[in-house]
Amino acid sequence: MDSADIRSAKAALEKAIQGKNIETIINIMTRLKNEVVATEELLKETRLGLVVGKLRSHPNEKVGEQAREIVKKWKADVSKGRPLKTTTTTSSTPSKHADVGSQAQKQVQKQSSSGQRTFKSDNVNVNVTDDKIRNNCIGLMYNALVIDSDESSSLIIAKAKEIDAQVLARAAGKTGSEYRNRMRSLYMNLKDKNNPKLRASVLRNEITPQRLSTMTSAELASEDRRKEDAKLEQENLFHAQGAKPQKAVTDLFTCGKCKQKKVSYYQMQTRSADEPMTTFCECTVCGNRWKFS
């Protein structure tokens, strides 16, 4: 693909993303993976890497996986020095080739694979305040935000400093336990490799540092963890002991799993007294459980 073809493919990809056409997105990315040999200059000129990079946190698993594969391949392309196509023009001086190769290598170091970028590898100074605790926390924020990211180090350190400032303000300007515990909680959630959406949302400013500093543990959690928590909550409801009415078996309810009508049930008041009671059902055939009110 030349630059014109790539721009055309990029426009089509953006349209497919906007229209949520998963099949088209995957088809276009397959072409990009097979036909594009990435160079630093090409990625800067077309800004294609930004579009594909954002898809790594796409809710569709296939789209996210393919986007990650493409980004990995393009990083390898740049690493191998493919921007230096071996033309026979003798006018190109060795020093120019060396300069371009050096720039490409620096770019690869900044865009290394998942888990390898840190503020140290990016040569970023995190000692930007007079407080050692704050500087350490800013470094932790940088290391968490940079996971799987191709964003510039200047953007990431700016975000890390903004997060520090917001958390510090909420802790009355003191780096005591409130500040440290909050920064530790944010670090643990941001560095979670199963939580790419949170990192991406912060870097895109979809979640501002101010908003991030006030988010609850449930809001910070990854989708997988939220599902696990919801499942656990449901299990706890069903296994709750105490003043629980006697179960009765009826054929009035149909199991959504096995379609049988041998269902035991009981009712409990789980909300306020003026709200309907919650009915807890369990299929006696397959063990499927559900509730409604």
UniProtKB/Swiss-Prot annotation:
InterPro entries: TF_IIS-typ, TFIIS/CRSP70_N_sub, TFIIS/LEDGF_dom_sf, TFIIS_cen_dom, TFIIS_cen_dom_sf, TFIIS_N, TFSII, Znf_TFIIS. CDD domains: TFIIS_I (cd00183), Zn-ribbon_TFIIS (cd13749). It holds the Pfam family Zn_ribbon_TFIIS. Residues 133-248 form the TFIIS central domain. A zinc finger (TFIIS-type) spans 251-291. It comes from the Eukaryota. Residues 100-116 have a biased composition (Low complexity). GO terms for biological process: regulation of transcription by RNA polymerase II; transcription elongation by RNA polymerase II. Residues 81-123 are annotated as: Disordered. Zn(2+) binds at residues 255, 258, 283, 286. Residues 4-81 form the TFIIS N-terminal domain. GO terms for cellular component: cytoplasm; nucleus. It is found in: Nucleus. Keywords: DNA-binding, Metal-binding, Nucleus, Transcription, Transcription regulation, Zinc, Zinc-finger. GO terms for molecular function: DNA binding; transcription elongation factor activity; zinc ion binding. Necessary for efficient RNA polymerase II transcription elongation past template-encoded arresting sites. The arresting sites in DNA have the property of trapping a certain fraction of elongating RNA polymerases that pass through, resulting in locked ternary complexes. Cleavage of the nascent transcript by S-II allows the resumption of elongation from the new 3'-terminus. NCBIfam families: TFSII. PANTHER family: IP08861P-RELATED (PTHR11477:SF0), TRANSCRIPTION FACTOR S-II ZINC FINGER DOMAIN-CONTAINING PROTEIN (PTHR11477). Belongs to the TFS-II family. This is Transcription elongation factor S-II. It comes from Schizosaccharomyces pombe (strain 972 / ATCC 24843). The gene is tfs1.
